[in-house]
Amino acid sequence: MAGTPHTELSPELLAHMQAIKAKASEYGLDFFEVVYEVLDFETMNQIAAFGGFPVRYPHWRWGMEYEKLSKRDAYGLGRIYEMVINNDPCYAYLQESNSVTDQKLVMAHVYGHSDFFKNNLWFSKTNRKMMNEMANHATRVRRHIERQGMETVERFIDHCLALEHLIDPHSMFMAREEPRRVSGSDDAGGFEPHKLPSKGYMDPFINPESEMQRQRDAHAAEVKSGKGRIPERPTRDVLLFLLRHARLDEWQQDILSIIRDEAYYYAPQGMTKIMNEGWATYWHSKLMTQHFLEAKEIIDYAEQHSGVVHMPPGGFNPYKIGVELWKEIERRWNRGQHGAAWESLDSIGQKEAFDDKSMKGREKIFEVRRIYNDVSFIDEFLTPEFVDRYQMYQFRKDPQTGEVRIVTRDFDRIKQTLLFQMTNMGQPFLYVVDGNYMNRGELFLSHQFVGLEIDASKATQALKSLRALWGRPVHLMIRVNEDNWLYSAAELNGEPKREKVGEDLPKPAHGLM
């Protein structure tokens, strides 16, 4: 794909941008400076294929994504109106074929996103100079390609990408260290003694064999006594465990660290999709309808906005659910419809009519914007009335008639299913529970069941990539239909084998399921 041709805002768009920015600030939005670039649809698709960045490391996935976006445009199945990057300053891309009305809507939307990026707790640990960091990642990967060859590096990246979701987003807010290091060597059940840095010819003097053997003996004694378990506790950040304990070459460690860093950068976006898109939609709606929409633009705006928030029966549109839930929170706190006094009212009619004129809605939504993610947002503020109003029921298509039918209207079941799907961004919880399984240097992972079963086909693919990176047999215990199954990848590039877990299975260092 080509470079990144771009144009600056026209004088007309610049004037609109300055007015929208000033009004957004008056409302209390606190955003990073936003740099706008106007792109043609081809360049827009290129950057979208790169995940919103103009430069990424070489890999076939970007070309595949570009082809998908180009075909979508060609068949009229949709187009990208805007992209905004969590960076300081934020970078926002506008489609040059958009009307002026569309561009104003997008700019108002972007300031909502930028405010959310800057102030939401879950974004607070992200790299605010990721535009530069992505370019740095690309340079490093190209350097490895020059030395190792494109095919070798690309194959390794494929394995890393198959595991990119095996991180622990909450660990950014906690200190979780794993000081012990293990390798796939045969000595002492896979233990690798700690060595001081030294040049090759000095190594026997700096790291004498007597000291290496002392460490091996001490480790063996710990293992025998049960104190030397690796990891010391179940570890959710599988990529970090691999970086610290797998036998990887330096170039492989560098690439795996790049994939992990980028996964952590994108994680908060997955954790706050409903809140973030709803927040941006709330503000573009308020700014446009109350301040920047001219009479001649009403129809165009209504058409564009309705497209953004359209949600068919059985569908789930984060823009729609997000914006309506933000409005609902504001309405309830404006009227005091929360707390013990309101909860004690007997009837739905009394609750709906209650109004203490407290007008705390705006204050409340800014508070929620600061500290919540999608799981806590839905858990605390979704109500049965909201589910009924927007028909957030569970639907299923009848295989015989093709009709979409309601499966359940039960609020608790609907809410629980939503929370299951949002927890960990819909990805399974996998933990490393033993890095030296059966004292053979094998890796054992376990799936923590939280209501939704793991996709066995995806699990086996991830297992094959884990086997490639670990260098020794890898095992994964998962739950399927109330039974526990063990998937084992013993041979490199071989298909994992499956067996039902029985009482005779040797126990890993830690239990989980």
Task: Please report, for each region that a protein language model flagged, where it lies by residue.
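Aromatic/His-enriched, Gly/Pro-containing loop or helix-boundary segments
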Residues: T4-L9, D73-A74, R79, M83-D102, ...
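Fold-level signature of zinc-dependent metallopeptidase catalytic domains
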Residues: P5-L9, L13, L94-S97, F117, ...
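Non-catalytic terminal regions of proteins
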Residues: S97, T101, A220, L293, ...
